Amino acid sequence: MSTTSLQQFATATSFSPFSNSQSARMSQSQSQTIGLDTLAEGSQYVLEQLQLSREGGNSENNSTFKPSSVRDSLAEARSMIRKNSSSAPVRRRISRACDQCNQLRTKCDGQNPCAHCIEFGLTCEYARERKKRGKASKKDIAAAAAAAGHQGGMGNRSPTDRRLSQEPGGRYDSVLEASRVQSHLPANGLSSIHNTQAAHSQPPLGSALDALHLNHFTQLNESGRSQMPVSDLRSLQILHNNPRSPSALPHGLNAYNDNTFSLLNSQEPNTTSLNHFRLGNSTDNPSAQFLGLSPPAQSPGWLPLPSPSPANFPSFPMAPFSGTSLRYPVLQPVLPHIASIIPQSLACDLLDLYFTSSSSSHLSPQSPYVVGYIFRKQSFLHPTKPRVCSPGLLASMLWVGAQTSDAPFLTSPPSARGRVCQKLLELTIGLLRPLIHGPALGEASPNYAANMVINGVALGGFGVSMDQLGAQSTATGAVDDVATYVHLATVVSASEYKAASMRWWTAAWSLARELKLGRELPPNASQPGQDGERENEGDNPSKRNQSLHGGNSNVNVTEEEREERRRLWWLLYATDRHLALCYNRPLTLLDKECSQLLQPMNDDLWQAGDFPAATYRAVGPPIECTGHSMFGYFLPLMTILGGIIDLQQAREHPRYGLTFRSGPDLDQYIMAITQQLDAYGQSLKDFEARYINSLALAENEPPENPHIDHLSPSGRSSSTVGSRVNESIVHTKMVVAYGTHIMHVLYVLLAGKWDPINLLEDHDMWISSESFLAAMSHAVGAAEAAADILEYDPDLSFMPFFFGIYLLQGSFLLLLAADKLQGDANPSVVRACETIVRAHEACVVTLNTEYQRTFRKVMRSALAQVRGRVPDDFGEQQQRRREVLSLYRWTGDGTGLALS
């Protein structure tokens, strides 16, 4: 009886035990190579598979010898290799690779620890069982089979096996007996098995599927398992473990019983489940229950299994976790999906980077793609009881962190970052399943995915009100989806594909409006005291996550969850107004939708879990500076900008614009917005005086028990206190400088023109009006504030995502003055132009975008003319500047920075 290697059995025999024809084997061996592109580059798997398939085909024709032609061709090829490689140094091949290199399919030097594990900080070990290549000896196989036959028998068969063998219709198949013999083989004999299927004829497909038994996979070793397409088995795991799944399978598969899925049943004894797939340095992976959360990439068309939605993720309970195997257990749901992308330790580092602050005095995200903190750091990084998160949100956070991380895994080779980021992006989108959001837990139909198609509406998406699906009882899962959209949209907006980012922003705004994030949730049935217990609710995961497991609308919502909803809405509210200016579009989220929503709380209090009483907090869109974070100083400016954008849209209206511009309401509108800007300017001065004076007092007399100190060490010296106070003072002045600059730009937008071409052409002689002089004074004031910004933040890393458009719009008037006045320009205008050029150069270094590079060249050309260096082709220079600026239009049909 001929034998084959274990790899051939796993690929060609395991999934077709009822096939014995050579053509069927060849077609199957070809189909198994479809997924080879997912292996690491440079893998030897393809060569081994090709050689094994040839040996397997030859052994079927003649088990005692190989054809002479094949032997001759192989000998000739080997001799040619020896001839060509005689001059090259001999490369010694290691006997075995470490477990990490074997799993990641990377080259290993065989040392302990190896160079690869040392470079990336992985745990290097050689715990895998040693295997021998080639066929096992017939003596060993015969001895193992005799021992198995002596120990086995009908008495040792499981009740399921006896029932299968006695079923009417002769459903017994030799594959069952072969798998039973294999399960009793010793470990060293698993590398080769009997190919008993070759002697049997092929039964009909239906009966073969009915008789198919997967127990012979349960004893496969790790090297054999690596060749199985695990993604094709995930849907079976969902079907087997989900209690809401239909009891009857599709037609033709009704003969499957419980033992059929014994590979995926972690509760069955003596069964090797998917937990045996090792992730990182974990010895016992508790995340295998999440392997079925992602729909299979190539699922068969005859198995219409329901795909799980992100709202169903919390229904999988977290397994007990050892604190030594994973630094942040919050990553458990996403670990199975990223195991082949990044190491476990790097995933923890990227999550750390997401929450890293660039300042030790006040929270300020270090990543340019984290525009504001929506979640509490302690809730995510809790060592034992973290916040329950959807895998899509976690993948997007890792993707954001990977954009700027300096980890060696992402910087060597140079193409590594792009490859990893692309895989994380695809994973995030796949886990998010855009525009399809599942119903509440306990209310989902077993064939939910099929109903979405049959009924013709996107249930749980944008076709049905979320209230009808009980979304408020699972608000956290839906909030995770909105936050994932925000991460995707933010990174795309900062790239050169700004127009494409509007798809993600629109999805985030629409879902936030459906979830009614702009409204306060009703109070809980048994509301706790405003003080006391609520302070500790943020650190009690059972309270924090209890809304994920309820099936009705009476589930209590913790104060942390309420604040997450508020902060997410206000972040979307601010970006809506910011992007309306960037892309010359009307507003999406209205002030009326959030007129009764509490304003976001102070970031330091938020991260510390100190939730103030709701009765002492303001509601509605703010217009005054209240803090150091984006919600404190930038959100009020965006509230005022929303009114300016509405005014500009009315001015540019194709039918009513002329009437509005000549009517009496325009002046009243401008006066109301001017009063709001004046109020913000006064609040900015009060904010600076209040914080700097209090910090000066704190420097002279350090507090004995500081209430908020999220980054300080346990022991504090006077020098440490002094440095922290100085840093806090600088941080406050930097916030004031940014707020002052944007405030002056809003004055310019209120009084002036937005489009640079209309500004330079000046057909209506606006340059000689009083409003131009007022706007010009604010443009110079914005440039002076930009000089202060460069002093406190030389690389403009404090808010690079938002700052670029305000720097650009505040520079158009200076460009006009330089273009018209040339050598007669006021010295203050010249200094302002020089400051703008420096600021754009810093912006290009921090967050490089095309419009900033373009405008820097335009301003340099105009500044050279102001200094008296007028070129011979002066007219051509002016025309070239206008051609460049014509790409970015803020006219009625212009798209601003979004190039089409």
Curated annotation (Swiss-Prot):
What Gene3D superfamilies does the database record attribute to this sequence? Zn(2)-C6 fungal-type DNA-binding domain
Q: Does the keyword Ribonucleoprotein apply?
A: no
* Induction trigger: Expressed in presence of xylose. Repressed in presence of glucose through the action of the creA transcription repressor.
Q: Where is the composition biased (Basic and acidic residues)?
A: 531-542
Give the matching PROSITE patterns: ZN2_CY6_FUNGAL_2
Q: Where is this region: Disordered?
A: 53-75, 137-169, 520-559, 701-722
Q: Where is the composition biased (Polar residues)?
A: 53-71, 543-557
DNA-binding region range list = 98-124
Q: Which domain of life is it from?
A: Eukaryota
Which keywords belong to this entry?
Activator, DNA-binding, Metal-binding, Nucleus, Transcription, Transcription regulation, Zinc
Q: For this protein, what is any one GO molecular function term?
A: DNA-binding transcription factor activity, RNA polymerase II-specific
Q: Name one Pfam family in it.
A: Fungal_trans
Q: What is this protein called?
A: Xylanolytic transcriptional activator xlnR
Q: What is the lineage of its organism?
A: Eukaryota, Fungi, Dikarya, Ascomycota, Pezizomycotina
